[in-house]
Amino acid sequence: MPRFGMVIDTRKCVGCMDCVVACQTENDVPHGYCRDWITTEVRGAFPDLTLEIRSERCNHCDNPPCVTCCPTGASHVEDFGKVVQVTANKCIGCKACISACPYGARYVHPDGYVDKCTFCTHRVRQGLDPACVSVCPTHCMTFGDLDDPKSAVNALLRSRTSHTLLPEAGTRPRVFYLT
């Protein structure tokens, strides 16, 4: 079984938000909500400052606190790709997973269940990339199997310095940012 992950090249991301709109459209995300978003962060120390623009989403962690705290099992790790998912009809809307997620990657859908990025597994099962990856005009996002040493994501991780968000949280995120 694959273990999906994503690599985002922060040198290429221009913050255009095509990924956000594609996700909202593909996944019928209600107006005013999003499963992914654009963040800007100033990195470094003056006078050597850089602006990092990055697309963020659920990190589909290897050690997801949102799964272990869920009282109903609605938050779970799917066998296919080891992707963190939410089963809407099992979710009671208690928000424990929202509190547990250090990345702010979840929200309560207007229908009362928690929603988040799914890595578009409905598309991936058909051999397609997630919607965000497929529309990116700068090709800054790469999706693939982290357990396949020959995958494009692994080639990128070997070729450049990368970081994850909040490594100190111990979640072992699977979204990597090339710097």
Where are the regions that the model predicts?
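Non-ligating segments of multi-cofactor redox enzymes
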Residues: M1-T179
